[in-house]
Curated annotation (Swiss-Prot):
Its main location: membrane. It holds the Pfam family HATPase_c. The gene is graS. The chain crosses the membrane at residues 15-35, 43-63. It comes from Staphylococcus aureus (strain MW2). This is Sensor protein kinase GraS.
Length: 346
């Protein structure tokens, strides 16, 4: 079937030749019918020989010219086609040379842009790490504040700044996340408690507590740093859109998979917004005047969850709250997925 495709392509590209040769032969036959001095038998012989030789010529040309395009169809690298001299006709060589020059130029641009992106990533990473020093010093100064009301307000703003810096750092590292992962069995409860501790200043100001209920063995096979980032972003959203209601956090076992749920009783997500919650920079259409949301939290979560093998479920009702469920994979599922990725890279 594939050969028939190439035959059809070849005949279509040579259709003007074929029509011209047929026209010339029909013209000779027409002249022989008008002019009786032309021996009709000899002319039929010449026309038959001419058409036969033309057929042989087309077959030989087909095998010679289609060979290069079959290499293209097999997705062979242009470098291999050029260096192995697989182009046979002058026009084919010219085409291959042109493609080689263009692809080489584009590859150089890609390498240059990748270097610029790496430098940009390194610059932002260094900036975030550098600014963490005065932010940490600021925390020490805030701890010395004796006015509790003022201290609480300052800690609230400090927690927001610290959270935004961490988010920016993770955004910068998104491109290199696969190289930055190390899988091991870690305690889900320990990660959740550590993240709750980081958000305690915000939750205290907003009058929000945490009801934690871990019913099953909470050890999961994951990367602790990126998994904590996911939990942090979900907790941050729950705190941001809730007031004076506790956030419920717990684990369940579904088909041998540990699942973590985080349930808030905030304003919820509308049905029209639900399909877009993972888009970069998307914020709720219900509160366009709100400036505290960057729309990056769930985008980060969605960008990382597949690498961790986590299945994410979000359910929400406007005015009643949102439940986010993280379903963690088994170890053999992670190993199998990583093996597939490794095979694809080769």
């Amino acid at each position: 079937m594939n050969n028939l495709k190439w035959v059809a392509y070849f005949l279509k590209s040579r259709m003007n030749w074929i029509f011209w040769i047929l026209f010339l032969n029909l013209l000779m036959l027409g002249i022989s019918l008008i002019d009786y001095d032309f021996p009709i038998d000899s002319l039929f012989y010449i026309v038959s020989l001419n058409l036969s030789l033309t057929m042989i010529f087309l077959i030989l040309t087909y095998f010679k010219e289609v060979k290069l395009y079959k290499h293209f169809d097999k997705d062979k690298e242009i470098e291999e086609i050029k260096h192995k001299d697989l182009a046979e006709t002058p026009f084919q060589r010219h085409t291959v040379d042109y493609l080689y020059r263009q692809i080489s130029a584009h590859k150089e641009k890609v390498v240059e842009q990748q270097l610029q992106l790496n430098m940009h990533e390194q610059t932002i990473t260094e900036f975030v790490h550098d600014i963490k020093t005065p932010v940490t010093a600021m925390k020490l100064l805030i701890d010395q504040e004796k006015n509790q009301e003022r201290k609480q307000a300052l800690l609230y703003e400090w927690s927001r700044i610290n959270s935004m810096l961490d988010t920016q750092l993770y955004i910068t590292r998104l491109e290199s996340q696969r190289k930055d992962m190390y899988f091991d069995y870690v305690s889900l409860k320990r990660m959740v408690i550590d993240e709750i501790q980081l958000t305690r200043h915000i939750s205290q100001v907003k009058g929000i507590g945490f009801d934690v209920d871990f019913k099953v063995d909470d050890y999961v096979y994951t990367d602790i740093k990126w998994c904590r980032m996911i939990i942090r972003q979900i907790l941050s959203n729950a705190l941001k859109y809730s007031e004076n209601f506790n956030i419920e956090i717990g684990t369940e076992l579904n088909d041998q998979h540990v699942s973590l749920y985080i349930k808030d009783y905030g304003r919820g997500i509308s049905k029209k917004d639900m399909p877009r919650i993972f888009e970069r920079g998307f914020t709720s259409t219900a509160n366009r005047n709100e400036t505290t949301s960057s729309g990056m939290g769930l985008y980060l979560v969605n960008s990382v969850k597949d690498q961790l093998g986590i299945h994410l479920q979000v359910t929400s009702t406007v005015g009643k709250g949102t439940t986010v469920r993280l379903i963690f994979p088994l170890q053999n599922e992670i190993v199998e997925r990583m093996s597939e990725v490794t095979n694809l890279s080769f």
